[in-house]
Amino acid sequence: MILSRVRVLLLVLFTTVALYGASETHVVIMHTNDIRGHVLPEPDAGGSARLATLVRDVKPDLMLDAGEMFSGTLISDLFLGAPVIQVMNTIGYDAASVGANEFSFGIHALAARAREANFPMLSANAESPIGEIQVAAIFNAQDVRIAVIGLTSEELMRTGRPQNVKYVDVADVVSTLETVLPRVRGRADCIVLLTNVSRADERRLARAFPEVRLIIGAHDDAELPVRVGATTIVSAGKFGKYVGKVDLTFNDGKLNRIESGLIPLEGVQPDPAIEKILEPYEAKLNKALQQVLGHAVGDLSRSTAQESHIGNLLADAVRAKTGTAIALINAADPQAGIRKGPITSRTVLEVLPSENTLVTMRLNGAQIKRILGRTVMSLSGVRVKLDVTKPEGKRLVSARLQDGTPIRDKDFYSVTTNDYLVTGGDGYKEFSEGISVEDTGILVRDALGEYIARLGVVQPRLDGRIQFSR
């Protein structure tokens, strides 16, 4: 038994009064959440190959995932989550709930992954054209009927990219369960919620439905289980560094005791079968990252305090991609400069590791000036003069379009920025006040890569688009 040789973290026992003399049955559930594409191992922790070994040794009756499976690593993002589903199939998952992360590549990709899965993907409250998503699944484990119901966070409608959730609607979790429970209650001995919702919603569910004795949720922290009334709420941390284990004890078909804990994957021997599955994906990924897009004839510097080579290149790339009059990107978005020599796909990824997308909108001149007066930005299509001795918000001395025309307060201009700034990043409320807003779904780094490939030869360029008054 794996528990005899692998350290168990945070083992917690919740017990009700034992039914002496009654027939006792144990159902073991293992669970994960927030994998986010982390199928490859990190230094001595995590990775699907280690998880496969644990699952093989423990031999759980049910293997479940509470969502946030796909986006978050290159190997998953490049193949739209396909490697994740393939290893989950091999490990032997029985069901997974649908989280916001599963919509990262759009509903068509989600539908494809759901078709590839050898297990049901569940959401009782997310309505979409994807027929492959189920409300619930019922399993027979040790002659105990276990109903597993999936729930998705309503936050999906706020945080999901508009083009990815255009045809999706997420209902309230409590009202949804009020409708779903009567349909499964008579068909199950035990109801388990597999949720990708907030902690507050988990507690609401536990208080509203005390007959639900176990909620398997999705939270980043590796934390102690929570008890709300008779309901136990568990999760297993992020990136597959731990796997959760729940032991349900039934006496004469009634749930009597719940034991739950986390098992770290550190030190577990990887399963060669999973490593073999991932090898071709790794090879294709490495080949893609080695692709040469262009050549830099000199070093391209990065700066958040003044005009920079990489900032100019990025802003010009963004504006070229969308065709707007102006591009405004936070100067801290590029995480690195570019050294003289070949520029590869890996170089672009190092410059822009985030998943930010391009958003177009129309802003009036007064809004643009307020943005420009706060701090230095990477910009294109506009030239500014700043006085950094003034307080933040009052630093703008002048702002003109590229042709020298002054930006007028009441005129409207087409602008491209990124979704980070539109959703309030760095405190720029003006971007959230734009009109004709469209999230293009185009990754900022893809726009940069395409622009570099089009140029072929990249010159470090400072042209005075940001100047400082003396």
What are these regions (language model features)?
Residues 1-4:
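N-terminal secretory signal peptides that target proteins for export/translocation
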Residues 288-309:
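Glycine-rich phosphate/diphosphate-binding loops and the adjacent beta-loop-alpha structural elements
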Residues 8-18:
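Bacterial N-terminal signal peptides
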Residues 262-265, 295-301, 328-338, 383-391, ...:
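A glycine-rich phosphate-binding loop feature that marks nucleotide/adenosyl-phosphate handling sites
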Residues 21-284, 303-317, 321, 327, ...:
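Acidic, metal/ion-coordinating pockets
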